[in-house]
C-alpha cells in the first residue's frame, strides 16, 4: 500500500532506507524576492533504532546554535528533531553543500573544545537543569568520527 504524500518533506522520507549519520538537503524554498532558504537534515542517530538523550541533545543544540555562527553568517536556525535523532540546519542564500559539511565539521571540532554549555542558566534557557557538556561532546565526537559518511544518505 502506497503512503499518501504529506505536506512535511520528512514525513515523505522512508526512514527505513536511510543510514545515519548523514547530512542531506531536506527542502529548498525560493522567496518572492529571490532569496533561497535551504533546510538540511543533519542526522546523528539511526531512525527507530537509536536516539540522543535529552540532556545531551539539548546541550548540543545550545553549543551548535552559538558556535556555528562563528563559521557562517548565513545560518538562520539550528533546531532539534522531535524524534531525537538529529537536527535541522536552515540557511539563507547559501547553496554550497560541501561548504555546509565543512562548517559542520569545524563547528563539531569547536564543540569538543568547549568548556561550558552557552546559555544554560535559568535566565537564558527554559530547562536549564537539563544539560550535559560531556554528553554533547560525545555526540559531536561520534558524528565527527563518521565524517566520511555524511554525504551517504542511503535513500
From Swiss-Prot:
Residues the record lists as binding Fe cation: 58, 62, 125
Segments traversing the membrane: none
Disulfide bonds: none
Keywords, comma-separated and alphabetical: Autoinducer synthesis, Iron, Lyase, Metal-binding, Quorum sensing
SUPFAM superfamilies, sorted: LuxS/MPP-like metallohydrolase (SSF63411)
Cofactor binding note of this UniProt entry: Binds 1 Fe cation per subunit.
Pfam family for this entry, one: LuxS
Cofactor(s) needed by this chain: Fe cation
Listed EC numbers: 4.4.1.21
Catalytic activity reported: S-(5-deoxy-D-ribos-5-yl)-L-homocysteine = (S)-4,5-dihydroxypentane-2,3-dione + L-homocysteine
Origin superkingdom: Bacteria
GO aspect biological process, one term: quorum sensing
A GO MF term: iron ion binding
Similarity section: Belongs to the LuxS family.
Function: Involved in the synthesis of autoinducer 2 (AI-2) which is secreted by bacteria and is used to communicate both the cell density and the metabolic potential of the environment. The regulation of gene expression in response to changes in cell density is called quorum sensing. Catalyzes the transformation of S-ribosylhomocysteine (RHC) to homocysteine (HC) and 4,5-dihydroxy-2,3-pentadione (DPD).
Subunit record text: Homodimer.
Annotated protein name in UniProt: S-ribosylhomocysteine lyase
Amino acid at each position: 500500500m502506497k503512503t499518501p504524500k504529506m505536506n512535511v518533506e520528512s514525513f515523505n522520507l522512508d526512514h527505513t532506507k536511510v543510514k545515519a549519520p548523514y547530512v542531506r538537503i531536506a527542502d529548498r524554498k525560493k522567496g518572492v524576492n529571490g532569496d533561497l532558504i535551504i533546510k538540511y537534515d543533519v542526522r546523528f542517530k539511526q531512525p527507530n533504532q537509536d536516539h540522543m538523550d535529552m540532556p545531551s541533545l539539548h546541550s548540543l543544540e545550545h553549543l551548535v546554535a552559538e558556535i556555528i555562527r562563528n563559521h557562517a553568517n548565513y545560518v538562520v536556525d539550528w533546531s532539534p528533531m522531535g524524534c531525537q535523532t538529529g537536527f535541522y540546519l536552515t540557511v539563507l542564500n547559501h547553496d554550497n553543500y560541501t561548504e555546509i559539511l565543512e562548517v559542520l565539521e569545524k563547528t563539531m571540532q569547536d564543540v569538543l573544545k568547549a568548556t561550558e554549555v552557552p546559555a544554560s542558566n535559568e535566565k537564558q534557557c527554559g530547562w536549564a537543569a537539563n544539560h550535559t557538556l560531556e554528553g554533547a561532546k560525545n555526540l559531536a565526537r561520534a558524528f565527527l568520527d563518521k565524517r566520511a559518511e555524511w554525504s551517504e544518505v542511503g535513500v
